[in-house]
């Protein structure tokens, strides 16, 4: 392992888990494990400076020596097609739900699988560390509500674009059939339908632009004492007087203005790259039509 700033990077220099940098053709560079580990440390420290020092989130709690020291532990392994994960380690308080934990991060060892090619290697590493580091901050300071993982992923996907806006890895979640734009009738709080919660990272872009840069952090401060849906409602009302219900209705409007109908001044700044929301054609055979259907909570 190597100690770099606030982080201890654990990695192998031989074998299946050996990390590697990629060359211009996106192939692994032999004997580049140390360079990869140095990149992990530099990027992780940069992410911490942005998320903690610039955005004002709490830092990462001390893990009391787990992993070989007080530094936060990042493990580099061959994860196949998985970018990374953050694992709760030891409880900090004794709350039955919503408690805080120390944690560690595991990341892929080369990001060679990432698509498009422009995001392979270091770009994939960058957004992964921005994403997973915020999970560490969430778990360590604000609390882990086990039935509300959706908002943890929404926030961490949003954080990728905040810290590294040029990468746009989150675009991959917007177009597939499981996304918010293709299945808006799935509840906002759903975390069991494919990867739809990842496509809802755009909620963070909406909240930050509509209610201010500190609005998402205020939601997390409320999560210390309430589950995410209630916490979001409380935070938005304190900031703007708007309820979650009101904000959600406006968000649905934002999601109408994407693709060829985007307006980067009024809505998403990168909305021209987003798909348009799914539409359903209805044939009228008379002057009146009655449509009966149901919607899940917080869906459109």
Regions found by a protein language model. Give the residues of each.
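Juxtacatalytic substrate-recognition/specificity segment
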Residues: 5-148, 155, 166-167
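Glutamate identity and glutamate-enriched acidic tracts
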Residues: 18, 51, 71, 77-78, ...
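Residue-identity detector for glutamine
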Residues: 25, 77-78, 138, 172, ...
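Beta/coil-rich, acidic/histidine-enriched accessory regions frequently appended to metallopeptidases
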Residues: 225-300
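Aromatic side chains
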Residues: 7-11, 57, 75, 134, ...
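Acidic/His/Gly-enriched intrinsically disordered linker/tail segments
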Residues: 91-100, 123-127, 143-210, 214, ...
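Generic signature of intrinsically disordered, low-complexity segments enriched in small/polar residues
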Residues: 10, 14, 39, 58-60, ...
């Amino acid at each position: 392992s190597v100690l770099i700033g606030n982080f201890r990077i654990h990695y192998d220099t031989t074998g299946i888990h050996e990390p590697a940098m990629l060359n211009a053709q996106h192939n692994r560079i032999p004997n580049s494990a140390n360079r990869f580990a140095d990149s992990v440390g530099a990027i992780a420290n940069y992410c911490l400076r942005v998320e903690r020092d610039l955005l004002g989130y709490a830092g990462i709690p001390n893990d009391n020596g787990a992993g070989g020291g007080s530094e936060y532990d990042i493990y580099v392994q061959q994860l196949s097609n998985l970018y990374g994960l953050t694992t709760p380690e030891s409880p900090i308080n004794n709350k039955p739900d919503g408690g805080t934990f120390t944690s560690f991060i595991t990341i892929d060892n080369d990001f060679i699988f990432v698509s498009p090619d422009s995001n392979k290697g270091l770009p994939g590493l960058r957004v992964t560390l921005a994403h997973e580091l915020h999970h560490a901050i969430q778990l360590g300071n604000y609390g882990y509500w086990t039935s509300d993982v959706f908002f943890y992923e929404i926030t961490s996907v949003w954080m990728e674009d905040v810290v590294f806006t040029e990468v746009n890895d989150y675009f991959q979640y917007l177009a597939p059939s499981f996304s918010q734009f293709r299945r808006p009738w799935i509840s906002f709080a759903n975390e069991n339908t494919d990867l739809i919660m990842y496509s809802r990272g755009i909620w963070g872009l909406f909240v930050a632009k509509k209610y201010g840069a500190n609005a998402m952090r205020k939601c997390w401060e409320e999560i210390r004492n309430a589950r995410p849906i209630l916490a979001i409602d409380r935070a938005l009302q304190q900031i703007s007087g708007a309820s979650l219900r009101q904000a959600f209705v406006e968000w649905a409007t934002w999601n109408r203005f994407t693709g060829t109908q985007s307006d980067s001044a009024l809505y998403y700044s990168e909305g021209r790259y987003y798909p348009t929301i799914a539409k359903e054609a209805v044939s009228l055979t008379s002057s009146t039509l009655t449509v009966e259907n149901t919607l899940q909570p917080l869906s459109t």
